């Protein structure tokens, strides 16, 4: 089953920080943009605590806290698809986390925070290769690879967003 990600620039919230989220089975990587939404930087790695059938746990609480404390205007959750665009069980986990973030934002009165799904094919592979190439040990790499993947997800989104916004024709 082909799974479609959101398109950067659609219903764009304008200037402000973005949060990139890489949902793994063990950890969740977070990356944050600058306020001009041009550059993604590693932010934090969380232990993944909330399962598909659980109520929200500390991982979702922490993501909500990061969003509110940093005045995030858009959250970009990686949508893990294979090279043909098909989804897997990982897609369910990513969509579940996105749903929980969206629900929490509404509950907290932060409905203006957009939660989008971005194509994340091969981001963990690219992040792992980049860490190895920069001399990061395998042990340390395990702790930061999720943040690095979140940076890849968010930076790809930011670059595509800028491209879309700069090439839009004004009627």
Swiss-Prot record:
CDD domains the record matches: YqgF
Principal location class: cytoplasm
Enzyme class: hydrolase
Example GO biological process: rRNA 5'-end processing
EC number from the UniProt entry: 3.1.-.-
Record flagged with keyword Ribosomal protein: no
Keywords, comma-separated and alphabetical: Cytoplasm, Hydrolase, Nuclease, Ribosome biogenesis
Pfam families assigned: RuvX
GO terms, molecular function: nuclease activity
GO cellular component terms, A-Z: cytosol
Cell compartments where the protein resides: Cytoplasm
UniProt KW Nuclease keyword: yes
UniProt xrefs under HAMAP family: Nuclease_YqgF (MF_00651)
Homology family: Belongs to the YqgF nuclease family.
Annotated function: Could be a nuclease involved in processing of the 5'-end of pre-16S rRNA.
The protein, known as: Putative pre-16S rRNA nuclease
Native species: Corynebacterium diphtheriae (strain ATCC 700971 / NCTC 13129 / Biotype gravis)
